[in-house]
């Protein structure tokens, strides 16, 4: 038996609903990947507590973001369509610089997803979704990118790509 359309759904195009579902999936994948990073830095042979804490917080933030979009989906009368989450491409990170670089690229993907969703909302005449993204996501995501870009610059300038001591100091002094 087919589901009846929601009575709540008004001015909510299926492409907006689809863009939100795509973003939810990306957030859940990012949360999973950040959890993998946190677990790596918690290993006894790596033991970088602040990197672990940083990536664990990122994992929780992505999970919270996915939940926020699921709530929005329900509020608008849409349907969250959850898919299987692919496992992270790697379980071992060759240090903080590589993990931070990967995290930065993940945040760039999240930013692009938000921008794509905003564009779809504008094209489909959905001021509610545009406002939601502008108030809750877009500026915050730019701040995240700025912070992580600064971390990468600091790690690079300290020579963390070649020297473990620089990475250790970054963990102790910058991420604490």
From Swiss-Prot:
What is the residue range of the signal peptide feature?
Answer: none
* UniProt-annotated binding residues for Fe cation: 27, 107, 141
- What tissues is it present in? Expressed in the testes and spermatogonia.
Question: Which GO-annotated molecular functions does the record name?
Answer: ferric iron binding
User: Which keywords describe this protein according to UniProt?
Assistant: Iron, Iron storage, Metal-binding
Q: Give the GO biological process terms.
A: intracellular iron ion homeostasis; iron ion transport
Database matches in Pfam families: Ferritin
Q: Which InterPro entries match?
A: Ferritin (IPR001519), Ferritin-like (IPR012347), Ferritin-like_diiron (IPR009040), Ferritin-like_SF (IPR009078), Ferritin_CS (IPR014034), Ferritin_DPS_dom (IPR008331)
Domain (Ferritin-like diiron): residue spans on this chain: 10-159
- Annotated family: Belongs to the ferritin family.
Under what name is this protein listed? Answer: Ferritin heavy polypeptide-like 17E
- The record lists the organism as Mus musculus
Highest classification ranks of the organism: Eukaryota, Metazoa, Chordata, Craniata, Vertebrata
């Amino acid at each position: 038996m087919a589901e009846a359309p929601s009575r709540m759904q008004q001015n909510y195009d299926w492409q907006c609903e689809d863009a939100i579902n795509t973003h939810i999936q990306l957030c859940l994948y990012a949360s999973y990947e950040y959890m993998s990073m946190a677990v790596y830095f918690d290993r006894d042979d790596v033991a970088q507590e602040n990197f672990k804490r940083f990536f664990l917080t990122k994992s929780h933030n992505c999970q919270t973001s996915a939940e926020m979009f699921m709530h929005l989906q329900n509020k608008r009368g849409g349907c969250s369509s959850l898919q299987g989450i692919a496992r992270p491409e790697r379980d071992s990170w060759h240090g903080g610089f590589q993990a931070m670089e990967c995290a930065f690229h993940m945040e760039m993907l999240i930013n692009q997803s938000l921008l794509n969703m905003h564009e779809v909302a504008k094209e489909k005449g959905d001021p509610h979704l545009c406002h939601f993204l502008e108030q809750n996501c877009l500026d915050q995501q730019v701040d995240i990118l700025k912070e992580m870009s600064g971390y990468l610059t600091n790690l690079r300038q300290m020579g963390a790509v070649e020297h473990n001591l620089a990475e250790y100091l970054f963990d102790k002094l910058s991420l604490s």
